[in-house]
Amino acid sequence: RLCMGELKHRFVLLQDGAAAIILNSKNQILLQSRADRDKWGLPGGCQELGERFQDTIIREIKEETNLDVKEEDLELVDIVSGESRRNDYPNGDVVINNTVLYCIKKYSGELKWDNESKNMKFFDIDKLPENQNDPDLIQIYLKRRKNK
């Protein structure tokens, strides 16, 4: 498995991945406080070679949150690309992510985070932290939800 975090580059990289809006029964959004920067973000990550996006998000959610998700419980929200998906990493890497965004309302397991996170917490939609890593993805989800 080769993920961009393992490489050291000083040019812009293009990376495909997936992220998830995970909602609890109170309609709160799960965010992770990332260990590599002082920002809250959505669970998700990069796609492995030959992997389907559905498998990417199911794997990333399990790795990062310990939650189990079934493919039939994935709701496609959007595919997001462009400059809004630019990430400047502390090691100097610059990555533009093509991100498949899912919404997940049904899952099982006990929430536990891995070493990629300092903390995880469900937030009320109107009380999200200001220091977000994925504000564009959250806004896309909120806009789509409002238009339904």
Model-flagged regions — what are they?
Residues 67-109:
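Active-site segment of metal-dependent pyrophosphate-handling enzymes
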Residues 24-64:
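Conserved Nudix-box catalytic region and its N-terminal flanking loop in Nudix hydrolases
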Residues 38-40, 110-148:
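Nudix hydrolase/Nudix homology domain
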Residues 22, 101-105, 122-124:
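Short, well-ordered beta-strand micro-motif
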Residues 15, 35-37, 42, 95-99:
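Short connector loops at helix/strand junctions that flank enzyme active sites
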Residues 1-19, 25, 92-93:
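Acidic, metal-coordinating catalytic segment for phosphate/diphosphate chemistry
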Residues 28-29, 108-112:
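Short helix-loop capping/hinge motifs at secondary-structure junctions, enriched
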